[in-house]
Amino acid sequence: MRCRDLTRRALGAIALTALLSVSARAELPSGQQAVVRQVEAYFNGIRTLEADFRQVATDGSVATGKLLIDRNRSAMRFDYDPPSKILLIAPGDWRLIFYDGSIQQVNVIPIGETPLGFLLSEEVKLAGDVSVQAVAERPNEVDVALVRTKEPDQGKVVLTLAREPMQLRRWSVTDAQGMTTQIDLAQIRTGIELDRSLFVWRDPKLFGWPKD
């Protein structure tokens, strides 16, 4: 249960992160607006990405695994390490699929309802339904804090990127109850070949449940 709760909080983090926009950009100082444009350019320059991730919840629960993103196919995969039996996959159509092998359960969420367009859209344009709450610049990193424009009290996402060269290092999401989940990335590789089979979802109800 602990691992499943942890992963569901991460799912929320992914969904919120995907809603990035900057309808309040005009209120930012010009230097911070420039940072936002740099973040856009960084994500638009990525076609494929592979990274190890470490996920930490407010209660200290930890999970690790591998993240794969193929923006050419609008596909994503979060593969959790054992003993977790969690798989989160967006196969490149309308679905975001959450598979929990420990209880043989599959949940399908329309991407349109929990938009992953931030990472999977053809063009990353930070404009729309979420506002930049703050941009914090440090010598080697920059934080971009985001909230939902119409529901700023429902939580926030903070993206942390390295500078020179720019690279996504982590993101965290804090919900309305003050619970925070953080995802740290390591061993990041971009511009690599990713086999399309990595993003194929075979429904276990039709093809059988994987064996332990």
Feature roles, as predicted:
Residues 27-45:
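Short N-terminal segments immediately surrounding and downstream of signal-peptide cleavage
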Residues 41-60:
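A short, Trp-centered hydrophobic/proline-enriched beta-strand micro-motif
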Residues 66-118, 181-182:
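An acidic-aromatic
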Residues 127-212:
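Gly/Pro-enriched, hydrophobic low-complexity segments
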